[in-house]
Structure formats: structure tokens, C-alpha cells
Amino acid sequence: MKYTELKDKSIKELEELLHAKKAELFELRVKLKNMQLSNPNEIKKARRNIARINTAINAYYSSSVE
């Protein structure tokens, strides 16, 4: 997921996507602890996606304040 894809979405869509990605990260961490995760790099990708979504949300709020 790229930032350019995220900046065109509404704030409601971004918050829903953020909630879904956090749930996905939780599931990945549970799988990692249970030794069921075949690719631990997925956790890194999920964290980066969450950071991108948070950046888009913060950009939306900072642009609406001005």
C-alpha cells in the first residue's frame, strides 16, 4: 500500500483501514508467538502500513486546521 493511494481516501475510510490493519498486526503477532507464522517479515510490512495510514490521517487533520 502506497501513500499516494491513501491520500485520496476519506478520513472515515482511513480510520476503518487503520482499525483493520491493527487487527491484522495483532493476528500476526499471535501467530508468531504460536510458531505458525511462516514469514516474520509480514509483521514489518504491517507496521509500515499502519505508519503510512497514520501519516495520511495526520496530514488530513493538519490541512483541515489551516
Curated annotation (Swiss-Prot):
What the entry lists under SUPFAM superfamilies is as follows: Ribosomal protein L29 (L29p) (SSF46561)
- Give the record's keywords alphabetically: Ribonucleoprotein, Ribosomal protein
* The keyword Ribosomal protein belongs to this UniProt entry's keyword annotation: yes
Biological processes, Gene Ontology terms:
translation
- What GO MF annotations does this protein's record show? structural constituent of ribosome
Task: Please name the taxonomic classification of the source.
Answer: Bacteria, Pseudomonadati, Campylobacterota, Epsilonproteobacteria, Campylobacterales
Q: Name one Pfam family in it.
A: Ribosomal_L29
CDD domains given in the database record: Ribosomal_L29_HIP
PANTHER family membership: 60S RIBOSOMAL PROTEIN L35/50S RIBOSOMAL PROTEIN L29, LARGE RIBOSOMAL SUBUNIT PROTEIN UL29C
InterPro entries hit by this protein: Ribosomal_protein_uL29, Ribosomal_uL29, Ribosomal_uL29_CS, Ribosomal_uL29_sf
GO CC terms: cytosolic large ribosomal subunit
Q: Which family does it belong to?
A: Belongs to the universal ribosomal protein uL29 family.
Coiled-coil ranges (or none): none
Range of residues in the leader sequence: none
Stored PROSITE patterns: RIBOSOMAL_L29 (PS00579)
> Is Ribosomal protein one of the keywords UniProt gives this record?
yes
Name of this chain's protein: Large ribosomal subunit protein uL29
